[in-house]
């Protein structure tokens, strides 16, 4: 059955990530340019956090209102660091896990992306959309 398939069949490999010292504007640019909603944060290859599109929206519009792109980038970089904005120690799934493992975690509804790790190192990411497409054969 598909739910017992390895998570490696569903996950995106080589996920787009940022390093803890990168500017917040880089996260914003990646989300806008790549059309993604979640950006893992790494120290070397070790997963240490994740930033979501909604995290950025909360601080971008909640605190800074309507700024043009460059002004907003400057304000974000001056006010926030990646480590301050990220959710630290995110829940993840092992690269040796199954589709069922990921579905159980994502099914709780607290978030929509799950970093995939080998030990502590980021090796992929799986989203609720990835799981739905896989299970529906889309």
Question: Where are the model-predicted features located?
Answer:
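Tandem CBS (Bateman) regulatory domains
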Residues: 1-14, 53-91, 103-107, 127-138
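Short, surface-exposed, polar/charged, turn-prone segments marking secondary-structure boundaries
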Residues: 12, 38-39, 45-46, 67-70, ...
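The conserved cystathionine-beta-synthase
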Residues: 18-35, 41-43, 83-86, 92-110, ...
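A glycine-centered beta-loop-beta connector
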Residues: 31, 39-55, 106, 114-129
């Amino acid at each position: 059955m598909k739910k017992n398939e390895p998570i490696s069949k569903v996950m995106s490999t080589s996920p787009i990530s940022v390093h803890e010292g990168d500017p917040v504007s880089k996260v914003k640019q990646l989300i806008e340019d790549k059309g993604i909603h979640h950006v893992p944060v790494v120290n070397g290859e070790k997963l240490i956090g994740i930033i979501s599109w909604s995290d950025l929206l909360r601080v971008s519009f909640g605190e800074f209102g309507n700024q043009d792109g460059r002004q907003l980038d400057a304000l974000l970089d001056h006010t926030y660091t990646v480590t301050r904005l990220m959710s630290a120690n995110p829940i993840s799934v092992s690269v040796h896990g199954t589709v069922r493992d990921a579905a159980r975690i994502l099914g709780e509804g607290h978030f929509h992306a799950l970093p995939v790790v080998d030990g502590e190192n980021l090796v992929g990411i799986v989203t609720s959309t990835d799981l739905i497409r896989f299970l529906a054969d889309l």
